[in-house]
């Protein structure tokens, strides 16, 4: 990362050409640049139409400029914005003009957000929420990211940390006055009450995290079954485009095919697996092995078949739904959708899940004609809503959050051990405070910062 005393700039809007493009500038020379290229500084936070000229006074564009004096800006530094016409040549001319000034350079990925973090405009959990919002593909992911960006976890962690500091101060005061009667005991008692309540609150948050971390990556649905029963046709139907090769020859699919979908506002990854059967072909055997492995890891398995749906289903820890395909070949029998079909006993590893859709749901469809697909998709959406029910409102959205909160809870628990010396109680509380400080990005997180901010786009 370049020194933060340099002034940076970058395109902050989307791909060119476009109707409008916005170039953001942040740093100590932002005001100088704006004055040099437009003739004067506009009033703070006021859009002004300007003629933008380079250092030779050649006209670059007729645009709009805004000025935000630090620290009352997005980054906490002086910030200028150039709103120009979104042509590539216009942007190139403005970039050349900005680059001609000393101490001014293009920004690196995430550098604007990192400067905002370093200047106290947002904590690390809020920066992660911004990253999640930028990468959100579904409505549920967007809602979760907005809550994180709004300080859902950060505000709580700051309050917890303040309580730990207050309790530590009481305990250390008791240590200082240990030789004066029962002062230490009088100070220790309320501190331990605070610690116990705080531990219970963090433990409750950890217990309620549900599947919030999975909401960022999505639920996995595996389509499995024997060869040539229409698995590839089904995934093409669900994706509404051709993602898998469809052939009347059995064994066409040899590897796992994945497609990311938005079903009911939830992120769902659907995988098409090789047909599961006995084979002497080593390539097909590997495909079957991978199919069984992915089905075993899935959150929901659609076991596709035709006819009477006899035979073995895959062993999985998730629900397995029987989906009878090709009902269009049975002379129009049935309208498709959920049916009360007898389901063959599944492998011992299968389990029934709570909620409306368990491990014994069954459907009739025609993947080719689309018959019954509406009911199947609606059922998957309902399953996803139940699957992610607790994840949208949970505080924790990343493994990093969970790990640090677990560390803090463990240290608080140790500090509550009976007859633990006050000095050791204070040390455990100090370590718990450090864990929460790392959660907020205030303590020893340089490596984490580099990884997080590198995921942002250049203009963010």
From Swiss-Prot:
Cofactor dependency: K(+)
UniProt name for this protein: tRNA modification GTPase MnmE
Gene: mnmE
Its EC number(s): 3.6.-.-
First-tier enzyme category under EC: hydrolase
Subunit field text: Homodimer. Heterotetramer of two MnmE and two MnmG subunits.
TrmE-type G domain sequence ranges: 218-385
Organism: Rhodopseudomonas palustris (strain BisB5)
Superkingdom of source: Bacteria
Cofactor binding note from Swiss-Prot or TrEMBL: Binds 1 potassium ion per subunit.
Gene3D superfamilies xrefs: P-loop containing nucleotide triphosphate hydrolases, Probable tRNA modification gtpase trme, domain 1, tRNA modification GTPase MnmE domain 2
Role: Exhibits a very high intrinsic GTPase hydrolysis rate. Involved in the addition of a carboxymethylaminomethyl (cmnm) group at the wobble position (U34) of certain tRNAs, forming tRNA-cmnm(5)s(2)U34.
GO molecular function term, any single one: GTPase activity
The UniProt record lists the keyword Hydrolase: yes
Keywords in alphabetical order: Cytoplasm, GTP-binding, Hydrolase, Magnesium, Metal-binding, Nucleotide-binding, Potassium, tRNA processing
Phylogenetic placement of the source organism: Bacteria, Pseudomonadati, Pseudomonadota, Alphaproteobacteria, Hyphomicrobiales
Residues the record lists as binding (6S)-5-formyl-5,6,7,8-tetrahydrofolate: 24, 81, 121, 460
């Amino acid at each position: 990362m370049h020194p933060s005393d340099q002034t940076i700039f970058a395109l902050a809007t989307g791909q060119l050409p476009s109707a409008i493009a916005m170039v953001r500038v942040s740093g100590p020379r932002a005001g100088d640049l704006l004055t040099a290229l437009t003739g004067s500084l506009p009033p703070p936070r006021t859009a002004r139409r300007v003629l933008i000229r380079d250092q030779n006074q050649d006209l670059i564009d007729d645009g709009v400029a805004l000025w935000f004096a630090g620290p009352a800006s997005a980054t906490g530094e002086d910030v200028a914005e150039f709103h120009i016409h979104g042509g590539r040549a216009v942007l190139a001319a403005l970039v050349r003009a900005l680059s001609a000034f000393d101490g001014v350079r293009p920004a690196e990925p995430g550098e604007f957000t990192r400067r905002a973090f370093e200047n106290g405009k947002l904590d690390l959990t809020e920066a992660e929420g911004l990253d999640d919002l930028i990468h959100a593909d579904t409505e549920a992911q967007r809602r979760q990211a907005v809550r994180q960006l709004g300080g859902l976890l950060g505000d709580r962690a700051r309050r917890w940390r303040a309580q730990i500091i207050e309790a530590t101060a009481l305990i250390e005061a008791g240590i200082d006055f240990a030789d004066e009667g029962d002062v230490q005991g009088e100070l220790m008692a309320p501190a331990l009450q605070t610690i116990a309540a705080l531990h219970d609150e963090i433990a409750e948050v950890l217990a309620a995290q549900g599947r919030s971390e999975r909401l960022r990556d999505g639920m996995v649905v595996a389509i499995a079954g024997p060869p040539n029963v229409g698995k590839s046709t089904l995934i093409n139907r669900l994706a509404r485009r051709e993602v898998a090769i469809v052939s009347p020859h059995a064994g066409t699919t040899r590897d796992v095919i994945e497609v990311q979908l938005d079903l009911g506002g939830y992120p769902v990854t659907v995988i098409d697996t090789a047909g599961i059967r006995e084979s002497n072909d080593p390539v097909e055997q590997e495909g079957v092995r991978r199919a069984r492995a992915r089905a075993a890891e899935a959150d929901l398995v659609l076991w596709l078949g035709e006819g009477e749906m006899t035979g073995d289903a895959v062993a999985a820890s998730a629900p397995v739904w029987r989906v009878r395909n090709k009902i269009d070949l049975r002379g129009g029998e049935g309208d498709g959708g959920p049916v009360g079909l007898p389901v063959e006993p599944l492998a011992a590893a299968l389990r029934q899940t709570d909620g409306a859709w368990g491990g014994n749901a069954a459907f009739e469809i025609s993947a080719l004609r689309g018959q019954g697909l509406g009911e199947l998709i609606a059922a998957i959406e309902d399953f996803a809503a139940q699957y992610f029910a607790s994840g949208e409102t949970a505080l924790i959205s990343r493994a990093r959050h969970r790990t640090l909160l677990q560390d803090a809870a463990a240290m608080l628990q140790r500090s509550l051990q009976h007859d633990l010396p006050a000095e050791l109680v204070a040390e455990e509380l100090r370590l718990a405070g450090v864990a929460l400080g790392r959660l907020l990005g205030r303590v020893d997180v340089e490596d984490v910062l580099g990884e997080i901010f590198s995921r942002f786009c250049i203009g963010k």
